[in-house]
């Protein structure tokens, strides 16, 4: 009986402290899944550099979240190197709706610079 009581207390404590994932809420990207965020960002950087810019190269991703919206929305904080080899830490949002023409919208928000919003095809 004592063991059953202990098991019940442990179960209740586990359930009370569990944090269920909210459907549609942003989720932090970690570990191996960070590679996918890196690929998504590099693909957008390449497409934009081939067009009218901006021209950045990824140095490293500091943090990332992903969210299912009307498509997917990746919010990435990363160190980017510009065409003058200057490294800056920027917040980048990639909203992907690949079924639309030019359905990838990329927003760069870098300190001390105006926000840049560009679109490209999938």
From Swiss-Prot:
<dbReference type="InterPro" id="IPR000010">
    <property type="entry name" value="Cystatin_dom"/>
</dbReference>
<dbReference type="InterPro" id="IPR046350">
    <property type="entry name" value="Cystatin_sf"/>
</dbReference>
<dbReference type="GO" id="GO:0004869">
    <property type="term" value="F:cysteine-type endopeptidase inhibitor activity"/>
</dbReference>
<comment type="similarity">
    <text>Belongs to the cystatin family.</text>
</comment>
<dbReference type="Pfam" id="PF00031">
    <property type="entry name" value="Cystatin"/>
</dbReference>
<comment type="function">
    <text>Selectively inhibits the activity of cysteine proteinase of hemocytes, protecting developing adult tissue in pupae from attack by the proteinase.</text>
</comment>
<feature type="short sequence motif" description="Secondary area of contact">
    <location>
        <begin position="67"/>
        <end position="71"/>
    </location>
</feature>
<protein>
    <recommendedName>
        <fullName>Sarcocystatin-A</fullName>
    </recommendedName>
</protein>
<dbReference type="InterPro" id="IPR053128">
    <property type="entry name" value="Cystatin-like"/>
</dbReference>
<feature type="signal peptide">
    <location>
        <begin position="1"/>
        <end position="20"/>
    </location>
</feature>
<feature type="modified residue" description="Pyrrolidone carboxylic acid">
    <location>
        <position position="21"/>
    </location>
</feature>
<dbReference type="InterPro" id="IPR018073">
    <property type="entry name" value="Prot_inh_cystat_CS"/>
</dbReference>
<keyword id="KW-0873">Pyrrolidone carboxylic acid</keyword>
<keyword id="KW-0646">Protease inhibitor</keyword>
<feature type="site" description="Reactive site">
    <location>
        <position position="24"/>
    </location>
</feature>
<keyword id="KW-0789">Thiol protease inhibitor</keyword>
<keyword id="KW-0732">Signal</keyword>
């Amino acid at each position: 009986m004592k063991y059953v009581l202990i098991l019940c207390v442990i179960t209740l404590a586990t359930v009370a402290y569990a944090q269920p994932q909210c459907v549609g809420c942003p989720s932090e990207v970690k570990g191996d899944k960070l590679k996918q965020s890196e690929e998504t960002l590099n693909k957008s950087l390449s497409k934009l550099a081939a067009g009218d810019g901006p021209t950045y190269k990824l140095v490293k991703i500091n943090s990332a979240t992903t969210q299912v919206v009307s498509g997917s929305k990746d919010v990435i904080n990363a160190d980017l190197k510009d065409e003058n080899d200057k490294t800056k830490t920027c917040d980048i949002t990639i909203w992907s709706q690949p079924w639309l023409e030019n359905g990838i919208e990329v927003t760069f928000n870098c300190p001390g610079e105006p926000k840049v919003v560009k679109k490209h095809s999938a």
